Amino acid sequence: HPAIVRGDFDMYPEYTGTSWQIVLKKTETYTNEKFNLLDQEYRRQYKLAWKGMFGFNDTYSLAIRADLAKRYNIKTFSDLAKYAGDFVFGAEYDFFEREDGYKALADSYKLQFKKAVDMDNGLKYQALYDKKIDVMTVFTTDGQISDPRIIVLEDDLGFYPKYMAGMVVREDILNRHPELNLVLDKLNNLMDEKTMSFLNNKVEINKENPRDVAKKFLMEKGLLEE
């Protein structure tokens, strides 16, 4: 953020929730209803505009093994709370230390797990498949959540902020090059969380080249020519 304000570059991708909390120093949870206010504050304070909102929300969530979700009919965090005492919860160490981490989430949803364990972030998924844990933290665009053995639950009380991705652009650039508005508008709702997770899976799991994955996707959407 400081670099674009200085004029080091003219646009960059950013997340709404990050900007709301870190840049604007707002304490209330960011929701999509606050987007117009976020954009207004960016224009007023920094002469920056939000354009080209990609359409995906890269926020925190909880995931459960699919067999358990089906057996207990668990679709939301609140559903999970009813049966949490039967389950082992796993998360990376810093999740238990953060202000918006385990304690705050457990208090908000009245979650009381049979056991909570901290583990390396890279080991969580395998631990879930191996039934060493039953529930874990995820990001909503993680490549591995497209695995059918996992169900991502709905944060039905809106505990976590929305981290919608979009472009932050200098207003003076938009004024000098109004045609940029049309280009950036083509990025609106380009992909949802499922699509982003699918693309991440190609890179994280299939080890495909990120540039090639992005290029192919943009060509399929008609935004790039061969």
Please give the residue ranges for each predicted region.
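A bilobed periplasmic-binding-protein/Venus flytrap-type ligand-binding module shared by bacterial periplasmic
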Residues: T59-K70, M164-H177
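Pocket-flanking alpha-helical
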Residues: H1-E28, N36-D39, L123-K124, T140-R149
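Ligand-binding "clamshell"
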Residues: V23-K51, D130-K132, Q144-G158
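Short helix-initiation/N-cap motifs at beta->coil->alpha
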Residues: H1-P2, Y93, K114-Q126
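A local structural motif
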Residues: G85-V88, A106-M119
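A conserved helix-loop-strand patch within extracytoplasmic ligand-binding domains
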Residues: F35-F89, N189-E193
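An extracytoplasmic/periplasmic, membrane-proximal ligand-sensing/linker region
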Residues: D100, A106-L111, E179-E226
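Alpha-to-beta junction loops
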Residues: V5-E14, A84-F87, A104, L123, ...
